[in-house]
Amino acid sequence: MIEKSFDTPCGAIRYWINDAPVNDAPCLVFLPGLTADHRLFERQIEYFEDVCRVVVWDAPGHGASWPFEFDFDLMDKARWLDALLAREGVEAPVIVGQSMGGYVGQAYAQLFADKLRGFVAIDSAPLQRQYVSAAEIWLLKRMEPVYRYWPWRWLLRSGTNGVATTEYGRRLMREIMMSYDGNKARYARLSGQGMWMLARAIEADLPYEIRCPALLICGERDRAGSCVRYNRAWHKKTGIPLEWIRDAGHNANTDRPEAVNRLIGDFMDALPPAKPRG
């Protein structure tokens, strides 16, 4: 994987891309969740980098995409992603978003529906207003002070054991979390701003319709918020296929990478040919 940088008015986004294999396979774009970085998808990158073109980023303010001004919203992230992909010549991406990455994918679908070839949500939830209560939105807007108040050791424990069920998944997330060790203020700001962005995107009450082939993946033991409930409702309302990952938590792709990789691979194989652009 080749590390690159994409400049925005708020800072530089770091991302990684492989030397694209010469085939007709779609480009997989991996978007990690809130506070996680590109390492969240290391097992997916290992599996797919010799199969197709692969892109993964450290989201704005995350990992190597720092320093970064917190003066952007979810739609800005989607626009930056589109510009980044355009620079790399990616015209019909398949977005694979975990948690917050899935929200970015839905924002991308709202803005660039004609470009999106496929969408896979891993332990994410729908952005449509109908799924979320007013109380939930109110809380999302006020989470930064909560993160500032909680002791770091508690945040570290909940951010590792609370999102993964396996030794590998927890160890990986702990390594990622430790990049914020000694700078809890950055972690609180990053987390709070992410929740605020999410609330604002939901309040916008946009269609966020997924018009391309899509797949929902969720860990059976996901305890992050109401993710399990949201996925059931999302599947029931839209008919988007939903696959449950046995014994997996919120980071299902780290707890059961072989199962998630198989589902993504099968999803890719079933995609119709990309429509010619012109």
Question: Could you tell me what each predicted segment is?
Answer:
Residues 1-12:
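N-terminal cap/lid segment of alpha/beta-hydrolase-fold proteins
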Residues 130-132, 150-209:
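Conserved alpha/beta-hydrolase catalytic His-Asp/Glu region
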Residues 97, 101, 105:
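Gly/Ala-rich beta-loop-alpha elbow adjacent to hydrolase catalytic centers
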Residues 9-10, 16, 55-96, 262:
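Active-site loop/oxyanion-hole signature of alpha/beta-hydrolase fold enzymes
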Residues 110, 117-149:
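Flexible "cap/lid" loop of the alpha/beta hydrolase fold
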Residues 11-64:
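Conserved HGGG/HGGXW glycine-rich cap/lid loop of the alpha/beta-hydrolase fold
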Residues 214-248, 254:
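Conserved loop-alpha-helix segment in the C-terminal half of the alpha/beta-hydrolase fold
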Residues 238-278:
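Catalytic active-site module of serine/aspartate enzymes centered on a nucleophile-bearing elbow/loop
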